A protein has these predicted regions:
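Structural detector for internal amphipathic alpha-helices that build alpha-solenoid repeat scaffolds
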Residues: 15-19, 36-50, 56-59, 67-80, ...
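Substrate-recognition/specificity elements adjacent to catalytic centers across diverse enzyme folds
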Residues: 310
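Bacterial Sec signal peptide processing site at the extreme N-terminus
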Residues: 16-28
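Sec-dependent N-terminal signal peptides of Gram-negative exported proteins
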Residues: 1-16
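Alpha-solenoid HEAT/Armadillo-like helical repeat scaffolds in large eukaryotic proteins
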Residues: 25-29, 56-64, 85-100, 127-135, ...
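HEAT/armadillo-like alpha-solenoid scaffolds in large eukaryotic assembly and transport factors
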Residues: 497-500
Length: 537
């Protein structure tokens, strides 16, 4: 008898457990007389992702004791059928009060805005626009984000006002810029160009503004070119009023023009390679001039504007430490252009000067130069190995390297150059054979993997797409950058486009997983743009 009772108890517990995982159990409790049970039912349905309960949950928006939880649940459960109920539930009378009722009403309005944004129905635009003007910051943040999700073009004036409002919180400005990009209307371009250069409370909005302009794409090219050439009177007046330096404007417009990759911008960018800032302090003038030049060079490299090669080469210097960043970006741009003659010029410059810049230049040359450059690297390394130990120790220090025995310093310094011969050795073996370069994608040396990525991209190898997609997640930033560029180049190859579109979800997943990882921040900004480009194929 005791065993029978125990068996019956266990059976009842199992049934109860199964019942609580069944949405119907909780749907039946939504009209319970006890408000606590109704709230619990809504919460459980949200946990169970029971979208079939959306209609019943939406009905509880009229229940003041359950309204907030119902709105929260509809963020996950709601669909177009719940839009009207959510709109009716918006409290347009609440202010920014600190009493419990006002706080609850504002929390509920924020959750309604989030639910409407997640649903993405344009009918929500007018209500969200009203909420974007609320006095409560939480409500405004949720509403502004939702306006982007529903692509409410009628909100562009309000969102633009937020961007230009000096009193607006930085986070709200960021949300407004993102929303303008999602809406994708060229009417947002003036506000977005302001966003490129403004700062609020020490916060830059360049990432959000540049990406939003990238999303708008071709319609942004002419306005950006006019700004870069001081041909937009409205922008000039705004920049003067807001004390925005020309160099920052030129550099950041060049950045976006490079993202969009529209050939119309090439002449404008070529002109910026010769920019000289008018600041009376020579050091500041050089710094600002270099800023504009390196962004212009980077943009021309992205666009593979081969005609820019000699002008970009002229920016490469191993002599002045102030030119380190400019040299790095210019050398990288030359590796993207892929003109082998420019690699020979880079290797000549690597023969003398500051060691950090020499290695940057030699590495760039090794990523696209002819195999014969390996002989020059070997000669260079031999010369370094015969240097004086004190000089070698000093140069290793500039590279953040150390050695216990100074007598070994010159050997270690020479190795920094000789190691760069590996991608040139691979080029000697592979030549223009894509299958050979595909095998090199698994090479233990990151320089070889980077060179293989570039070679496959230049060759238009559709078969390389899966391997390159994997390399876009490589731990080495050099390899990531090369794989991202190669995939971008392949987007112009019709045979590669189906495979490229197929990897867009994979790249989106990678971006989500790596969000917040500062080491990959810059690389993933590039990958983010690539993912959008591929998803649009």
């Amino acid at each position: 008898m005791r065993l029978l009772a125990l068996s019956l108890s266990l059976s009842l517990l199992a049934c109860r457990s199964r019942d609580e995982s069944d949405p119907e159990t909780w749907i039946r409790r939504l009209d319970d007389r006890d408000a606590k049970i109704r709230v619990q039912a809504v919460q459980q349905l949200r946990k169970l992702k029971a979208k079939q309960a959306a209609r019943e949950v939406a009905a509880l928006l009229k229940d003041p004791l359950v309204k907030e939880d119902a709105a929260l649940a509809l963020e996950d459960l709601g669909g177009r059928g719940q839009v009207d109920a959510l709109l009716d539930a918006v409290d347009t009378t609440v202010g920014a009060g600190s009493d419990a009722a006002a706080r609850a009403a504002n929390r509920t309005n924020a959750r309604i805005a989030e639910a409407l944004g997640n649903i993405g129905d344009p009918r929500a635009g007018p209500a969200l626009l009203r909420l974007a003007r609320a006095t409560d910051d939480t409500v405004r943040l949720a509403a502004v984000e939702a306006l982007g999700n529903v692509k409410a073009s009628e909100a562009i004036p309000e969102l633009s006002h937020i961007v230009d409002d000096a009193a607006a919180p930085p986070l709200l400005i960021k949300r407004a810029l993102v929303a303008l990009g999602q809406i994708g209307d060229p009417a947002a371009i003036p506000a977005l160009t302001h966003g490129l250069v403004i700062e609020r409370q020490g916060v830059s909005f360049l990432p959000e503004s540049s990406f939003a302009l990238f999303l708008i794409g071709a319609p942004a090219v002419e306005p950006l070119m006019k700004i870069a050439q001081d041909q937009d009177p409205g922008y000039l007046a705004w920049a003067k009023e807001n004390n925005r330096a020309p160099a920052g404007t030129y550099a950041k417009t060049a950045l976006v023009l490079g993202d969009i990759e529209d050939a119309r911008a090439v002449p404008v960018l070529l002109a910026k390679l010769k920019y000289v800032d008018s600041d009376p302090v020579p050091g500041t003038s050089r710094l600002l001039s270099n800023l504009v030049k390196m962004f212009a060079a980077n943009a021309l490299g992205r666009m593979r504007a081969v005609e820019a090669g000699p002008a970009i080469q002229a920016l490469v210097s191993t002599i002045n430490p102030q030119d380190e960043d400019l040299t790095t970006l210019a050398a990288e741009a030359l590796s993207w252009l892929g003109d082998r003659a420019q690699a020979r010029e880079l290797m000549k410059k690597a023969q003398k000067g500051l060691v950090k810049q020499r290695i940057v230049v030699a590495q760039a040359a090794a990523l696209f130069g002819e195999p014969a450059l390996g002989n020059e690297l070997a000669t260079l390394a031999t010369r370094e190995s015969k240097g004086s130990p004190p000089a070698c120790v000093r140069q290793l220090g500039e590279l953040a390297l150390s050695v216990d025995d100074p007598r070994q310093a010159c050997g270690l310094l020479a190795a920094q150059f000789s190691e760069l011969a590996k991608p040139l050795d691979a080029a000697r073996v592979c030549g223009a054979e894509a299958p050979c370069w595909l095998m090199r994608m698994q090479d233990p040396d990151p320089d070889v993997r980077a060179r293989a990525s570039y070679e496959l991209g230049r060759a238009g190898s559709a078969a390389a797409v899966p391997m390159l997609a994997g390399a876009a997640a490589d731990e080495q930033l050099l390899v990531r950058a090369a794989a991202t560029r190669a995939l971008d180049w392949l987007a112009a190859v019709p045979a590669a486009q189906p495979a490229l579109k197929g990897i867009a979800p994979q790249l989106a997943s990678q971006l989500a997983q790596e969000q917040g990882k500062t080491r990959f921040l810059k690389a993933n900004e590039e990958l983010r743009r690539l993912q959008v480009k591929l998803s649009r194929l």
